[in-house]
Amino acid sequence: MKRNTRNCREDIAKFPQRLKSALKRLIKDNSHKLFLCCLFVIIGTFAALFLANLINDAFTHRSLSERNYLNIFSLIDGAFSDEQPRKLFWIFETMAALVCFVYFFSSLKPYQAEMYQVTPKIEIPKPYGQKQHGSAWFMPDEEKARIFPAVVLFLADDKIKRLLAEGLRRAEAVDNGQYYHAKPIGIKGNIFDEAGIVLGRNATAIKEQISCITDDVHTMTIGSTGCGKTRTLVLQTLCALALAGEGIVVSDPKGELYHYMHTFLETLGYTVCVIDFNSPRKSMCYNPLQPIIDAVNRGEINEASEKAWDMVNILVEKSEKGEPIWTNGEMAIIVASILAVVYDNQDRPEYQNLTNVYEFISNMSVPAQGEKEIQYKKYLRSIPDNHPARQTLAIANVAPDKTAASFYTSALTTLRLFTNPTTYRITSKSDFDLASFGTEAKKALFYVLPDERETFYPITTILVAQQYELLVVAAKKTGNRLRYRVNFVLDEFGNFSKIETFEKKLTVSRGYGIRWNLFLQSFAQLKLVYGEEVANIAKGNCRYWIYLQSTDIETNKELSEAMGKYTTLTYSLGSSAQKYSNPSSSVNVSLIERSLLTAEEIMNGFERPYSLVISNNSPAVMESPDISKWAFNDMLGLGDKKHNQRLIELDENARPSYDGEIEIKLWKPWLELAAKTRKAVNAENEGHNSMF
């Protein structure tokens, strides 16, 4: 009884709001009729005045020529001068109003459900019933404020004003055709306590409240090429992370992010590193063999071998159709050669690189001049039993010659990229420590990649995987948590090579203070690289899916299913007409199940600035405007399209470049082996001759 009373009170309390909403909807759906009704009322009022005066004058025997029937004021005066014409006027006015009423309500469609506006391009029926067929619905604003806590940018704050002024100076320099050299401006501490992927903003004249994901969770963003993710999400996210002083690792197709961001980061006191495969002569350097070199230098030979296998697992492209022996043989050759190059050159670091690994395989897999035995077999006999390359190299040594030759050829094909002098320059030494991005404050790393080809993604994948492993080791030394949280912001992650056990890395990394923010064009990319099972686990380990736009049908279907179902109304119309009887019609109403958003609505209904966020909470529709409407735009010194192009041009031209000839330093152990062989043969021949 109490429950029914409470429900009744709630219904009564909600009645005015529901009535107001219904009236608004009624007017909106019949706006064309409303205009005609208003027009008819005006004409009808004039007609009522005219007829009331005309009839009254006729019955009172008044001369019709005494009144001007086209003068509205004369008609009003005549209609309200006496009771009789006034009654006539109200009779005619009521008739006009009745005609309007009948016209307005005669053809209303009661089978049109009340609609809810999701985005300007999506309207869906509102929910009805008691959730019999599903209870999914969109996240209300008050819940958004709780789930996505806002970090606040106070525009009058002294630190913010200094950053805005610095950005203005950069913009003015660009307008004047000058490069602006950034310097730290001495901002102590961080402006935000924490930050993350930016989803939206609420701006006033004095502040910007920025909604972002601050928890230790991973995100997966779906956005096809040209959907606007850089200008509505990525730049805002990088700026927010920078103001929080967090570690940043970014994959940057085309290099726009580096050019836009590095000056701002340096102003905040960041150390900015860049591996630039787009302009390799301007790039900093990092040797992919560095973790293996460090392990060998520590005497951790088993660890060095494991790291070599981990690296080669990423480097070697695997085929599910072929026999495993070919892939395993190729990998064994590369691993053994890496261990040989690193272990045998501990006092000659200039030779410890993948270019020398390529040359090692190329020259050791063929016989020396005038010999039949390949150099690998002679090398295997020359190294001690405890040499780390010995057991791995034996795999190829026992294979038939033709099979082993296939291993060597495949290995050389995989490593061919490192024969390029500019690639050698980038990968022959290390200018920074990958682990330092979680142990030292304010460090950012950009991987600039050509957008027209995927050649350098395997190297980038290796460095990302190695950095993760090194960060985990660093975290275990500081209470299983990095001193500074590190954020991987990996655009075009679908082009990355496969990272072994990536799904497990996602599971444990957030506890160490490592967050993965992955950007894909569709879920199909992840499935293609990792297979369906691992891809599903990886998707499950990313708490938030952020949808911008995708033309992939299966991706949109999966998102639709993930959003769930809700209960709404459906109408069916019926009519009957029998002989000798009046026709009749009926409207039947029933509750049905409906997808919160269909795949078609998702695919066609989201354009910037709107995004869809799916998680274990209710789906949220967020609004993040273009960077040009943010204070961040002024801090970065950005402007219109032409200004930004000029900024990139000036910044690129100002970067230091190594323009000299790149000398590749080669180890050449095959020459030593050939010399030893010749010496042994000569000694044997001399001994044989002395017997005679």
Residues of each region from the PLM?
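Short, flexible active-site loop motifs that bind/organize anionic cofactors or intermediates
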Residues: 42, 492, 546
